[in-house]
């Protein structure tokens, strides 16, 4: 792996008011101290590295800047005041930007996009977030996103994003990626690398009106209380590549309808004597299988068979009657 370029990308000058403050909602608070999320995208590109650097890279960088005008939380920082009575928030200043790394790799592109491979093959493609800094009164300033573009000459390239979940969920991130891709395509087709904003926007713009999220049950206050006493520095310095990933294979498994039915039948047979007949949904049996496989793959040594293991799944709430809006960055 050879790093070709390290730079910072920000929204166009004066395109976002400075400072801009975004309060966190009760949806966001639980993610404040969670490990960063990584998402990687692969693209075929059968050309040498120099061709990529001269043609595609300038378009990607210019279009990213334009995209960040509308998705500015990704170039912002998470602010955690030392005073536990002051809530964390997202802050954008006109000096803020995100880390953008360009690298070249001799890795086999076809292997990287194959279905079954060593999980460590992707690790060199993943950027780390820049280290947090400290402002006056010991306020912690934590970068929200870092991007790495890795070129595999004459075969393809990858774009990997490491980001704090507090700024966006999966739907918001994919909105960001689709928007960036659309602007890039627009710029390439028009052969125009200027930052002129006259071209029409390719997709719907995100909403950052977090004050529209209602919290009648006071969940935000409860979540904030749970954060008190948490040592953020331990997590901030944690290695994104865990030891549990050593000697592991990454593979996508697709369950057919017939296999799901067999699972349901097998579980029903096991449970009929002790629990009687129960309805088993596809979600329940699939989640149970995933849960079991995750625990086995982590090879955690348990002293007791009945040690508690949690399985957490996320749910979309944008279309509920109370929260019919676009959350976070999109």
Language-model region placement:
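Long, contiguous juxta-domain segments that are non-catalytic but functionally important
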Residues: 1-26
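Soluble acyl-CoA-dependent acyltransferase catalytic core bearing the H(X)4D motif
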Residues: 11-19, 33, 38-73, 77-330
